[in-house]
Amino acid sequence: GATLRITRLRPSGRGADVWDELHPTAAQQVQLYDWLVARGDGILTGDSFFHLSGLGQPGALAGLNLCGAGRVVCLIDPVGDVYACPFAIHDRFLAGNILADSGFQNVWQNSKLFRELREPQSAGACGSCDHYDGCRGGCMAAKFFTGLPLDGPDPECVQGYGEPALALERDKPKPSGDHSRSGGRKGPIPLKLLKLPPKKFCNESPV
């Protein structure tokens, strides 16, 4: 049968404008956790919901139990910039550029940022929490874009440590620039249209 992949709403990109209004309540987090555990491997979550692992037994929730940024995942944007995470598009998490830095392999293996992310991380403010081994402090991008310290609790910490941190005065980072780099070509971009009939109808038709 089919599987479903769901992704956590993070306060980055366009999500930054709606996160305060739309992110799940504590009760909804529990409901989501129970739903994910009940469906097991039929739901693909990647590392999106490891911050919920403190609600149950270790290993009950499918997927990684740590932030995969720079370890198992990264993002390459249309101009070749490599970021540690698809949800962390900011100069703070820019590892390099595949065009300027001798290709992706060099960036992935030798970037200073990626090497730092792969080192053992300090538990910081979460060091005294019994559930730290389960969630590893939560999502790096969620913390950064809500103005919380990277060694602090996830803003949606299921043990309740995120809410007091969010109540403090915070400096939310702004986008570090226009990553579209649209200042080059002016005018329309010519497209190459297919003049020969497609080999299969489904190659052209969305239905």
Predicted regions located by residue number:
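Radical SAM enzyme [4Fe-4S]-AdoMet core and its adjacent flexible, acidic
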Residues: 1-82, 87-96
